[in-house]
């Protein structure tokens, strides 16, 4: 894979990171303690997640901050090295780029704030999905694209 293609994939990562960063900045400065009802199924509400996905280990006492930050850092470094050194189907590279941008977005929060800033809430009637952010969306999209690329490969 040439440098132009590699650069394009890193631009995807940077775009994911910046979308996450500025959306969290908006959430921090505009939401505060209030909730914005977007539509029947979605709200914007500020939440600070000290754990991992679905607040896993959120009340573990603080050590989990560095565990999750270390894990995200290792994943980010592996993704960077993979994008730089290996040639993949373009869809697999896009999936890596999305995951990288999302991982760095949440890693930034953990290192700077000690928690991840979440603000998107989906719900249906009385069922509420855990609050999440655009980094989580990028990671999820990356995993879905990875599965599609893998199925396409076979």
UniProtKB/Swiss-Prot annotation:
Biological processes per GO annotation: proteolysis
Classification via NCBIfam families: lspA
Active site feature: 118, 136
Entry-linked InterPro entries: Peptidase_A8
Native organism taxonomy: Bacteria, Pseudomonadati, Pseudomonadota, Gammaproteobacteria, Cardiobacteriales
Segments passing through the bilayer: 8-28, 36-56, 66-86, 88-108, 129-149
Keywords, ordered alphabetically: Aspartyl protease, Cell inner membrane, Cell membrane, Hydrolase, Membrane, Protease, Transmembrane, Transmembrane helix
Listed name of the protein: Lipoprotein signal peptidase
PANTHER family found in the cross-reference section: LIPOPROTEIN SIGNAL PEPTIDASE (PTHR33695:SF1)
Primary location group: membrane
Pathway membership: Protein modification; lipoprotein biosynthesis (signal peptide cleavage)
Uppermost EC category: hydrolase
Functional note: This protein specifically catalyzes the removal of signal peptides from prolipoproteins.
The keyword Amino-acid biosynthesis is annotated on this UniProt entry: no
Subcellular location: Cell inner membrane
Organism: Dichelobacter nodosus (strain VCS1703A)
């Amino acid at each position: 894979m040439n440098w132009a293609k590699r650069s394009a994939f890193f631009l995807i990562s940077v775009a994911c990171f910046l979308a996450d960063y500025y959306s969290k900045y908006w959430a921090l400065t505009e939401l505060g303690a209030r909730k914005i009802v977007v539509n029947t199924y979605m709200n914007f509400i500020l939440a600070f997640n000290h754990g991992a996905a679905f607040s896993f280990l959120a009340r573990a006492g603080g050590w989990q901050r560095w565990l999750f930050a270390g894990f995200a850092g290792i994943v980010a470094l592996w993704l960077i090295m993979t994008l730089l050194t290996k040639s993949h189907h373009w869809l697999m590279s896009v999936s890596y780029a999305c995951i990288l941008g999302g991982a760095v977005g949440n890693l930034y929060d953990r290192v700077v704030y000690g928690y991840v800033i979440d603000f998107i809430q989906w719900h249906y009637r009385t069922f509420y999905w855990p609050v999440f952010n655009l980094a989580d969306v990028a990671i999820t999209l990356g995993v879905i694209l990875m599965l599609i690329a893998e199925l396409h490969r076979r």
